[in-house]
Amino acid sequence: MADSFHFSIDIISRGKGKSAVASAAYISGEKIKNEWDGITHDYTRKERVLHKEILLPKNIPKEFKDRSYLWNLVELNEKASNSQLARQFIIALPKELSIEENKKLIEDFINTNLVKEGMIVDYAIHDESQKGNENIHAHLLCIMRPINEKGEWQAKSKKEYILDEKGEKILNKNGKPKT
């Protein structure tokens, strides 16, 4: 099977000079204007975007499938200069599988672990190798705030600590509470 594996998670944050709209334009190979700062991000020349899609929880309005609408709404909803806008995953996919098999694999992961938990996920499958299927990977962008069935933003979820049978926080090896 795979001779190497990569799985990384990062936060798209204004405090780091990042933009959810720019990230969405990049992963999808699209041109999207950021209504927060007026900058247009054009990645239409990006090649080898094999598939792109937005997956929604069942009760979320269908307009959230529009990439520009979704990520501009995120940008406009978060007011702070250091706002956390999205979670970003980059996941290597097995080059031995076909594009359709990889699509099914990543969608199963997304639906089981993210959409089922109420997250909207914008994802794309890329292959940046010249030979084809040598560097196949998926980019996932997930919203940070839940949205209700009316399309209204909810509060960001707080950390939930793992407690022992006495209700005390369980500490990890660094002495910090486990979440």
Spans of features found by a protein language model:
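N-terminal nicking endonuclease/strand-transfer module with a His-rich metal-binding environment
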Residues: 1-179
